Amino acid sequence: MLSLVQKIIGSRNERFIKKVSRIVQKINSLEPEFEKLSDEQLKAKTFEYRERLANGEILDNLLPEAFATVREAGKRTKNMRHYDVQLIGGIVLHQGKVAEMRTGEGKTLVATLPAYLNALTCDGVHVITVNDYLAKRDAELMSDIYEFLGMSVGVIVADLNPQQRKEAYACDITYGTNNEFGFDYLRDNMAYEKEQQVQRSRNYAIIDEVDSILIDEARTPLIISGASDDSSEMYNLFNRLVPYLEKQEKEEVENEQEQRDFYVDEKSKNAYLTEKGYAKIENMLKKEGILEEDDNLYSPHNITKMHYLNACLRAHSLYQLNIDYIVRDREIVIIDESTGRAMPGRRWSDGLHQAIEAKEGVKINAENQTMASITFQNFFKLYNKIAGMTGTADTEAFELHSIYGLEVIIIPTNKPMIRKDHHDEIYGSVREKFDAIVEDIKERISKGQPVLVGTASIEASEVLSTLLKKKKIRHNVLNAKQHEKEASIIAMAGYPDNVTIATNMAGRGTDIILGGNLEVEIAQLEDPTPEDIAQIKAEWLKRNEAVKKAGGLCIIGSERHDSRRIDNQLRGRAARQGDPGESKFYLSMDDNLLRIFASQSMAERVKKGLKGGESLAFGFMSKVISKAQGKVESYHFDIRKNLLEYDNVVNTQRKVIYEQRQSFLEAEDVSDILADIRIDVAEQLFHDYVPAGSMHELWDLEGLEKALKSDFMIELDLQKLYEEDDSLGEEDLKRLVREAIEIEFVEKTKNLDSGAVRQFEKFSLLQSLDTHWREHLSSIDHLRNSINLRGYAQKDPKNEYKKEAFELFSTMLDNFKYEVISSLAKIRIVTEEETQRAQQEWQESMSDIKAEHESVIDNNQRHDEDEQEEAPKVQQVRREGPKVKRNDPCPCGSGKKYKQCHSKVE
């Protein structure tokens, strides 16, 4: 019935394309008129549109003329004319949607349309790509169009200084990577002067490869951190002990004889000790002198040892060299599981990175303390409008809409797509699969067809390379180890009988042109004559035709990825712009996808039915594979959704802190802010010792006097005042405390330079807020890592997390207010020059910070399945002894006051 309705009225996508096609017709009708304009008249259009906007016209009304302007500028500056389907793509992007456009359809050119239109508001447009190379390339390619129309273009890359960044952000259109935009946002919220901030408003963002950025990288927060204590000795110790532990093949075993020391969950990438394993590691630690004879790992004071142990256990049992990471220049470099690219600068969290450094014998870098962090999910929600482009988004349409509110529109291709997708072939073993791939390659190159082989890991690419060498088949390998050669290898990939092996989507963002890349060949010539160029073009045309006759580029996948989208990205490298092409995937029942997610009975039946070298290529196996991929995609979606639910709690708090901080930063005079804080602190302090509405017998006036003296340098004999006049009530005493704090500050500052006082007050506010926010993030991390244990007490961990995170936040704000007033009361306010010097020293102490895109495997995600299991009831712990007041010594024995120690985390 549904298909019948769709045939009559069309799908939503078809109806949308039909609707915007009317706008395209209007743009096309303007083309003859704009062709008649002189260059100066065309350039003047930008000023005209901005005037019309200032007079109340809206962008949607300007769209046809603005797009016609950009199209004409493209023809005059780049000899490139936007096709109708590219105009549709531009409209989709302007409307804040995701445009799915096939490889080779000109997404870079499409972005110029909405970028120009939205830059007319003078609020800035950010065009976001996945790496520095693409950001610089796209900005350079399109800058002629923008600059012709009077628009300035900037590029944000990793090696820019703050002034260069500020200038780039001031441009009408700014290109850059998702990481750089995110880190600049965090750094701006750590600045101590307004002039140090580089970004302006986050108005409109166009995200290239939107699926990669908003989905693949959604679990990896951007983190700015500073080094914490060195723990390399403990990592080295556990790295030495873990190899003595034996792996148990599955979680449940039938008898004790089969029990080993630990088992792994490959889906969640976690490892768990058995009771036997706990006993074994405890004995080893006692022999090493790390544990006392009567001690055990379950003790609360050994929680850090468990942290090191779990990290090293996962490093040895779940993370493999040349699959999950490589060692480059004596450093561990993560391999992105979706793209196969090396990700320098990215680090795993939870001590995993340090554990792998210990495993590989390289320098162990200290774990870091988080100073600021944000996920891409919440960073991009800061923009007024976002849009995205990619070749593969339809399979992730539900997630893009449910989390980001982005609708996916599939844009028709300019020319019909004629790629031939063959059935998958499934073999019994990995070796048989690779042998079949080699034979297929051999057959295809014999007729001059170029082949691109996509592998899921560096290890697989090197195994395949070894087999091809044995057969004396020339080939290029493109993986994280050869990343420097990426552009040149991809440029050659379309040559006749050329074989290229690439891990996943290495080289994504660069078109593979049949016959080779003509522009690259011409660029490599030194002082070419017109005759040289003509000869190169003639040779290229011959190669291009030869490759087309051979069937175009053939894509061979050495295994299916966890996500259908990644498979589609690989397929999408072939048959660009109406060219011929083919794709085929080879699988084995030992591949991770089928081994982990397909049913065991199915795998056994398939293996039994296949004799050596035989394969299956039936339709029902496609259903099995699709079902397995669906399981993985659903699992990863749940993880990302779960991450967002937890991060939203911190995000709400982050917004409050950053808005408050910005108000401090922008204020010329913070004395009114401090006056309000002093009132809050006076009330807070008073009620710590005089409970609201309580009888006199419960008042602790002596304690209040001591707190005023120790924390605010105020001598106030409240007990004597009350004895002299017992009519003094609670409100009278509170007023006396409030006035005493206010008078003390006025007296302290009355003879000082007001400029120095104001500057010092602002600096103190910012410094104190930053310190407390940083400590709060650490407390939140600890809470997050332990909150799943609440499930064993029959409590919902998420609700408990929200409740306790709010309590932590409220306590942090109270402590911030209290300590900033206390510190201002104690510190001698000095000259303006000394204040500036103190500020500079503080900023220098903050200079040893790192901006990292951390690969997080969240403990909350690992225990998602555990949360569903019935947990045993546990007895609630009740406080023994009297309540500890905020100004009492902390019972932990640290020597600090309770308010400055464990009050923050209780």
UniProtKB/Swiss-Prot annotation:
InterPro entries annotated for this entry?
Helicase_ATP-bd, Helicase_C-like, P-loop_NTPase, SEC_C_motif, SecA, SecA_CS, SecA_DEAD, SecA_motor_DEAD
The superkingdom of the source organism is: Bacteria
Which terms does the record give in the GO molecular function aspect? ATP binding; metal ion binding; protein-exporting ATPase activity
Q: What coarse category fits the chief subcellular location reported for this protein?
A: membrane
Bias (Basic and acidic residues) occurs at 853-865, 877-888
For this protein, what reaction is catalysed? ATP + H2O + cellular proteinSide 1 = ADP + phosphate + cellular proteinSide 2
For this protein, what is the EC number?
Answer: 7.4.2.8
Give the matching CDD domains: DEXDc_SecA, SF2_C_secA
**How is this protein situated with respect to the membrane?**
Peripheral membrane protein
Basic residues composition-biased segments:
896-906
UniProt keywords (A-Z) are: ATP-binding, Cell inner membrane, Cell membrane, Cytoplasm, Membrane, Metal-binding, Nucleotide-binding, Protein transport, Translocase, Translocation, Transport, Zinc
Query: Where, per UniProt, does this protein localize?
Result: Cell inner membrane; Cytoplasm
Q: How is the cofactor bound?
A: May bind 1 zinc ion per subunit.
Annotated Gene Ontology cellular components are: cell envelope Sec protein transport complex; cytosol; plasma membrane
State the top-level EC class.
translocase
One GO BP on record is:
protein transport by the Sec complex
Annotated Zn(2+) binding lies at C890, C892, C901, H902
Q: Where is this region: Disordered?
A: 853-906
Q: Which of this chain's residues are annotated to bind ATP?
A: Q86, G104, E105, G106, K107, T108, D511
**Requisite cofactors:** Zn(2+)
What is known about what this protein does? Part of the Sec protein translocase complex. Interacts with the SecYEG preprotein conducting channel. Has a central role in coupling the hydrolysis of ATP to the transfer of proteins into and across the cell membrane, serving both as a receptor for the preprotein-SecB complex and as an ATP-driven molecular motor driving the stepwise translocation of polypeptide chains across the membrane.
> What family does the entry list?
Belongs to the SecA family.
Subunit-structure text: Monomer and homodimer. Part of the essential Sec protein translocation apparatus which comprises SecA, SecYEG and auxiliary proteins SecDF-YajC and YidC.
Q: What is the designated name of this protein?
A: Protein translocase subunit SecA
- What organism does the record attribute this protein to? Francisella tularensis subsp. mediasiatica (strain FSC147)
